[in-house]
Amino acid sequence: MKFAVFLIATGIALAQSVVTNLADAKWTHDKGDPPGSESVFLREDAQTGGMELLVRFPAGHVIAPHWHSVNERVILAEGKLSVRVGTGAEKVLEPGGFAFLPAKEVQRLSCVSNTRCTFYIHWDGKLDNHKVQ
């Protein structure tokens, strides 16, 4: 009981559960992205501002080089996603593939399959986006 009282006293908000399947997700079109791109907002951490989304991009879509001030994690659900971080080699993820993209590292992602790419993204803090020229 002391633990519960401590949580209330410190004002820590308890997280809400999120349980969904791809087939049940409510997809919305992303403004500013190519036709056919969609996302599903899953949750945001009230304390860190971190977010989790499902994202779909059409075949051939390239996400231009950019970086974030926070770490990013990607898990590919369908398609083939090319990932390049910093000056490292390009790696193609297949379904089930995982990428950890460190904060402030330039990243470039592209859907290199003949079908759309669907993936989960988690940012561990408030999202910002810095384009690289």
Language model feature labels by segment:
Residues 14-51, 132-133:
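A short, N-terminal "cap"/entry segment at the start of jelly-roll beta-barrel domains
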Residues 51-68, 102-104:
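Conserved short histidine dyad/triad with adjacent acidic residue
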